[in-house]
Swiss-Prot record:
Residues in coiled coil: none
Protein name per UniProt: Arginine--tRNA ligase
GO cellular component terms attached to this protein's record: cytoplasm
Species of origin: Escherichia coli O6:K15:H31 (strain 536 / UPEC)
Gene that specifies this protein: argS
Short sequence motif named 'HIGH' region, residue ranges: 122-132
InterPro entries the UniProt entry points to: aa-tRNA-synth_I_CS (IPR001412), Arg-tRNA-ligase (IPR001278), Arg-tRNA-synth_N (IPR005148), Arg-tRNA-synth_N_sf (IPR036695), ArgRS_core (IPR035684), DALR_anticod-bd (IPR008909), Rossmann-like_a/b/a_fold (IPR014729), tRNAsynth_Ia_anticodon-bd (IPR009080)
Location within or outside the cell: Cytoplasm
Length: 577
């Protein structure tokens, strides 16, 4: 049930009947304050100006055509021409009943699309670090939301699995006579990588061998391909452990690394030349883009092939977008890549559009995000100033949560405590990130994220268990409750019901904008409204059975909404805390 969409259409029709153009925008929004009703239509100002009318005069005319019978109990004009809409308690009660009768809580399915989501993208032969966290969990929240709404989602883990580093690694492994890569842990590979890089920089003979190995690997030599595959396998096996710990839906089947696009690159360069988009410049192949200017104010040159014949990330990203449209048949492509890559992506996509590889009707969206900072406001590092490995971060989260949970539940059995600590610890790390607007940097703070107050995972998980405890005390099952009517008489009942029915609107925003913090804010607000409702509207000690059962149904929908909302974020719920 999308009340905002329903009201928008009703107000738009009334505006047209009052003389507004057919493309008028009613600007129906959820009201910020309860005294302004549940929704507010703010579109009169812009339209009245075009019509040469006073906004309030237009609002009065719109009201004469606005039929909200059975939806609103009151509609009023406020200020210069805002229209405040107060939902009818009977309408709220009816739709709470409908939401409870639906497995999807009354959430409709939009027109199905094929949506490719590019996220996580770790590098082969390196352990995942905290820099991979945001892309991985924000991207996964978007995937979960889009899948719940019924879209066909293709996860694309754009792994860094190609390039000169593989020549280096294979050459160094060979030198050490440790070619059986299958027996190595990833931590060994990280050490190998550092040693290989050192030799590559200092030993010209070794560097030359590494460069030759890259050529052999790229030409398809089976020995080198097999070594490369082993390196990829070790890395992705280790990464899968991290994905599973994070409760992220990525699997090995979702890997679409840089190597996938490599065979396409010569053809793309040739095609861009044939189309007159790419030209030779100082031995390299370059596309000059009018949309981007260099320091001299001239069109910026984007290199797609170096003079030594090598390709660049831009070339791969052009091939990648082309593949996602032509082969995966994407209707929409979302990229969860940090904000520092924005210009690079915009340049690649400008070339993609000019070449006609992806039509304008298929959005390519950079859902960029900021950095994770320490308490000092600088990039999050270890005490020694090194990169924090993601596995180490999750270990610490689990240890801190274990202490916290044991303190609150000294008699809890060990296996139950471990399960609860895992849900709280991993949930806390994820929720702390997801609850912040992804476009901004955020401060990583253990104390804040593990607090049982405020917009945190422990608070939300506790709020869910609190609602469940009402049912345990009520000793009533869902079947018994199903036949009971919902009756809304108190203001707090109406406020809770209206917020519950805004779940679909929240999902729609997250799906459109890729902003899971909107869901976090909604769930936190919902938990707060339930708390106020629980305090002021007695449930178990209600004046009669009808009111008791009606309030239990509001509690039931609250629990289901919290659980489903947290699930779209990849946050685990627990039955008891």
């Amino acid at each position: 049930m999308n009340i905002q969409a329903l009201l928008s259409e009703k107000v738009r029709q009334a505006m047209i009947a009052a003389g507004a153009p057919a493309d008028c925008e009613p600007q129906v929004r959820q009201s910020a304050k309860v005294q302004f009703g549940d929704y507010q239509a703010n579109g009169m100002m812009a339209v009245a100006k075009k019509l040469g009318m006073a906004p309030r005069q237009l609002a009065e005319q719109v009201l004469t055509h606005l039929d909200l019978n059975g939806i609103a109990s009151k509609v009023e004009i406020a200020g210069p021409g805002f229209i405040n809409i107060f939902l009818d308690p009977a309408f709220l009660a009816e739709h709470v009943q409908q939401a409870l009768a639906s497995d999807r809580l009354g959430v409709a399915m939009p027109e199905k699309q094929t949506i490719v989501v590019d996220y996580s993208a770790p590098n082969v032969a390196k352990e995942m670090h905290v820099g991979h966290l945001r892309s991985t969990i924000i991207g996964d929240a978007a995937v979960r939301t889009l899948e719940f709404l019924g879209h066909k989602v293709i996860r694309a883990n754009h792994v860094g699995d190609w390039g000169t580093q593989f020549g280096m690694l294979i050459a160094w492994l060979e030198k050490q006579q440790q070619e059986n890569a299958g027996e190595m842990e990833l931590a060994d590979l990280e050490g190998f990588y550092r040693d290989a890089k050192k030799h590559y920089d200092e030993d010209e003979e070794f560097a030359e061998r590494a460069r030759n190995y890259v050529v052999k690997l790229q030409s398809g030599d089976e020995y080198f391909r097999e070594m490369w595959r082993k390196l990829v396998d070790i890395t992705m096996t280790q990464n899968q452990i991290t994905y599973d710990r994070l409760n992220v839906t990525l699997t090995r089947d979702d890997v679409m690394g840089e190597s996938l696009y490599n065979p396409m690159l010569p053809g793309i360069v040739a095609d861009l030349k044939a189309k007159g988009l790419a030209v030779e410049s100082e031995g390299a192949t370059v596309v000059f883009l009018d949309e981007f200017k260099n320091k001299e104010g001239e069109p910026m040159g984007v290199i797609i092939q170096k003079k030594d014949g090598g390709y660049l990330y831009t070339t791969t990203d052009i091939a990648c977008a082309k593949y996602r449209y032509e082969t995966l048949h994407a209707d929409r492509v979302l990229y969860y890549i940090d904000s520092r890559q924005h210009q690079h992506l915009m340049q690649a996509w400008a070339i993609v559009r000019k070449a006609g590889y992806v039509p304008e009707s298929v959005p390519l969206e950079h859902h960029m995000f900021g950095m994770m900072l320490g308490k000092d406001g600088k990039p999050f590092k270890t005490r020694a100033g090194g990169t924090v490995k993601l596995a180490d971060l999750l270990d610490e989260a689990l240890e801190r949560a274990r202490r916290l949970v044991a303190e609150k539940n000294p008699d809890m059995p060990a296996d139950e405590l471990e399960k609860l600590a895992n849900a709280v610890g991993i949930g806390a790390v994820k929720y702390a990130d997801l609850s912040k607007n992804r476009t901004t940097d955020y401060i990583f703070d253990w104390d804040n994220m593990l607090a049982f107050e405020g917009n945190t995972a422990p608070y939300m998980q506790y709020a869910y268990t609190r609602v469940l405890s009402v049912f345990r005390k009520a000793e009533i099952n869902e079947e018994q409750l199903a036949a009971a009517p919902v009756i809304i008489r108190e203001d707090r009942e109406a406020q809770l019901a209206a917020r519950l029915l805004q779940f679909e609107e929240t999902l729609t925003v997250v799906a459109r904008e890729g902003t899971p913090h909107v869901m976090c804010a909604y769930l936190y607000d919902l938990a707060g409204l339930f708390s106020g409702f629980y305090e002021h509207c007695p449930i178990l000690s209600a004046e009669n059975e009808e009111v008791r059962n009606s309030r239990l149904k509001l509690a039931q929908l609250t629990a289901k909404t919290l659980k489903l909302g947290l699930d779209t974020l990849g946050i685990e719920t627990v039955e008891r805390m």
